[in-house]
Regions:
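Basic, polyanion-binding surface patches
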Residues: 1-223
């Protein structure tokens, strides 16, 4: 273990490594938008998503209050990268224009991905993503003082997965040795390696974490 001295630095971004999420949402004209992001984390059956408030995804979530969180595997990096520097907003917001963004109406076509109908929300899922979570917006929290960023608190209504990532012999568990999420760290794509050390925390049965949002999700009818 390196016990060297720390040095104070001021990175422009603090993206130390989180899963990439392809957020699908519904545009005002009823078409589907698809946008990659990685400022996301989960607490039980809820997720917190950090988005620029002027982005098309944020505007769609604010208007419709629903979306899908599609989690790509590491093998899907080329498809995700085809969405880089694209926006569903037309005209392109000034801040994105300065960074080289351009408008694309058909994000699924641009990425070469397949939309499939969702169970409980209007936006489609991404067929190729091993994990998809249909969500509704429960709360929106401002971040910072300039109003440019918001944190969406979303509640999961359905979790849908490919059989390839389910743990054998179980109904409701993901196999972490089979699931290989695409990770973004400081704007670059990475995957996960093998487990590096046995986990004491993993001795706790997952069923002990099941909260009331799961029962609530069961009562949501299919659309």
């Amino acid at each position: 273990v390196n016990s060297g001295a720390h040095t104070a630095i001021e990175p422009g971004i603090l993206y130390f490594g989180t899963p990439v999420v392809l957020v699908s949402s519904t545009n005002e004209d009823g078409s589907a938008n698809l946008a990659p992001m990685s400022s996301a984390f989960w607490l039980g059956w809820r997720a917190v998503l950090g988005l620029g408030v002027r982005s098309r995804t944020a505007q769609n979530l604010l208007r419709t209050r629903e979306g899908v969180l599609n989690l790509p595997s590491e093998s899907m990096a080329p498809a995700v990268d085809r969405l880089a520097l694209t926006t569903g907003s037309d005209p392109v917001p000034a801040g994105k224009l300065a960074r080289g963004y351009f408008h694309v109406a058909d994000k699924f076509g641009r990425a070469g991905l397949t939309p499939v109908a969702s169970s409980t929300v209007a936006p489609p899922r991404v067929a190729e993503c091993p994990v998809a979570m249909e969500v509704v917006v429960e709360a929106v929290h401002p971040v910072g003082d300039d109003g440019g960023v918001v944190a969406f608190e979303v509640r999961v209504q359905r979790v849908l997965v490919h059989e390839s990532v389910r743990m054998a012999g179980t109904e409701d568990r993901i196999d972490p040795d089979a699931w290989r999420p695409l990770i973004m760290s400081f704007q670059k794509f990475y995957g996960l390696g093998a487990q590096v050390h046995p986990s004491t925390l993993a001795s706790i049965p997952e069923r002990l974490y099941r909260g009331p949002d799961i029962e609530r999700a069961r009562r949501v009818p299919a659309v």
